[in-house]
Structure formats: structure tokens, C-alpha cells
């Protein structure tokens, strides 16, 4: 019996996240446009990034409580690169429109501060309570939710 248990445990690979403070649920509170100095206050809106393992879920709960977008990402100590976005259409058993569908229009991601299908963000600040990311055109300020 012990041999079976050890064999079973040895064959399992436990995947853990190395995301550090990036993991979690983030409220997008402000978007600054770098070229113009303009600011959009989103603190009263419900726009969120959820980060877990290798996936970011972005959604605007005020517009659609159940659907948003998923993006893959890579990160280093000083930057995050989002890529491979998908529309979250819930479960595949919902017919032809169910399941996650790749998107090719970056405008769909703009409400979340993402302007390209692959976007690089510099980590200006990332700690347990606050995150500031800067792309070539925007600065995004988040608060941990």
C-alpha cells in the first residue's frame, strides 16, 4: 500500500507559481496617458485584473459580470509581457459560441489598459498592496483587492 502511495505521489508534478506579489486580484484605479499627461480615474469602476500562475483574467464587472478576456504572460524582475489573448465565452458546452476564443483585435483589450495583442509593461511598483505598470503609452495604477 505504501509503495502505491509513494508511486502515485512521485508521478504527480505540483506546479507552483513564481509570480510573487503579482499574483492576486487587482483593481485598475487609474490610467495615465504618457504622451498627453491625461488621467482617467477608474476608482469607482469595477475593472479588474486577476493573476494566477501563467494567466491573467481581465474583466469589467460593470459591463459584463461573467465574461472578459484571458491573456498569457511572461515576467522578469522588471517587466511583464502579456500575449495570446482569448475571449472568455464561458464553457465549451454552450454551443458554437462557448469556450475561449482567440482574439485578433487589440481594441477589445483597450478598456483594461492593454493596447496591443502582445504588450510589454515595466514594473514601476509592485508590492503587496499596490502595482504600477507602464507600457509605451500608458501608466496603469492598481490596488490589491
Walk through the language-model features, giving the residues of each:
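Transition segment at domain starts
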Residues: 27-31, 39-48
